[in-house]
Amino acid sequence: MLRFPRAALAALLFLGVLAGCASVPAGHDPRPPTILISIDGFRADYLELGVTPELARLAREGAQGAIRPSFPSKTFPNHYTLVTGLRPDHHGIVDNNMRDPQIPGVTFALSNRQAVTDRRWWDDGEPIWVTAERAGLRTAIMFWPGSEAPVRGVRPSAWRTYDAALSPEARVGQVLSWLEAPRSARPRFLALYFEAVDTAGHHYGPRSREVKEALAQTDAAIGRLVRGLAERGVEANIVVVSDHGMAEISPERVIRLDEIVPAELGAPLTMGAFLTYYPAPGREAEAEAALVRSHPHMSCWRKSQIPAAYHYGSHRRVAPILCLPETGWEIATAESLRKRPIKGGDHGFDPYAPEMQALFLGYGPAFRRGTVTPLTDNVDVYPVLARLVGVALAENDGGPALAAAALR
């Protein structure tokens, strides 16, 4: 697997670590805690809507820019990329829904609690909390994908089982309570997750009143976190990211899969903003003939022929055939349309589409003030986190551009 040359990246980050530790007594590391916050579905340009004053202040007083999600621009693959620095094709969470020939009879899905907590799905990557725990640093995770499994045999010091009903205020309260521990027992790395913006974007579309309301609600929760830190005298580096953006979809922009390939030739696993397709045994050639050809508003490939720009197709969990529509077009069947009409918004589209760009924001003593960072791939967030936390890099696909632009 190709990787960014680790020697060069490690040297850059190590020099930063040394600079931050100069004249520090042995055995004492003054680094403040790092808090990683995900606002699921926060499109990069949402910051311009004028409904997030807390985030706007953090952006003015810190570093902010846009990041490009990894393919597919879905929730679980990109959340794991953010904390491992690996492309989905390398860390193994290649979709929200996937199969693995080494785990027969099981389909990984967000709703499959047994699969979500099974380390075998996650062990191809090393999230930063595992690296930190192995280095003797405490971590505390609130709802980050992967944190409910003992990845590579390691769990965070503290973590919570995902509960969508838990209010943003309660989530912030839990993070603040973790930080009330004595300095020697305080977590070095914490993560926090909010999904309301993504939910509203799916149901109502990215420019809807409901999205603005969800943005305001989430922004208020982050404001409470910042004030709570100040009240407790806790200085922290805060990194706010999103996993992907959101694009408008419409019933006028639908590609009917059942009009392209007969049902007996195979079955889709994922449909919508992209398609993963499994031909029926013995019908592979017919399925490929139907799908892997020219289509209006859609491109299809065998997994071995997916364009290199997507860094996707080598992992055993990638489906045999992948189809990607133009951004804003949805792949569906008559049956799926009866269950879920096409409306609102979606993601999973080409990560190079502007609508898929996600937020990056860094605030705290380690960040340059008033800096706009260049558009980078989201694998570059991981080296920033490693530098902040003070841990060695695990194997990753990230580069130094974001760290160089954002950090002092």
List each language-model region with its residue ranges.
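Metal-dependent active-site segment of extracytoplasmic phospho-/sulfohydrolases and closely related
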Residues: L36, E54, Q217-L257
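Short, structured active-site-proximal loop/turn typified by the sulfatase FGly-forming signature C/S-X-P-X-R
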Residues: D45-H91
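His/Asp/Glu-rich, glycine-adjacent segments
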Residues: L86-G205
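A long, amphipathic alpha-helix that forms part
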Residues: L166-E180, L190, V197-I238, L385
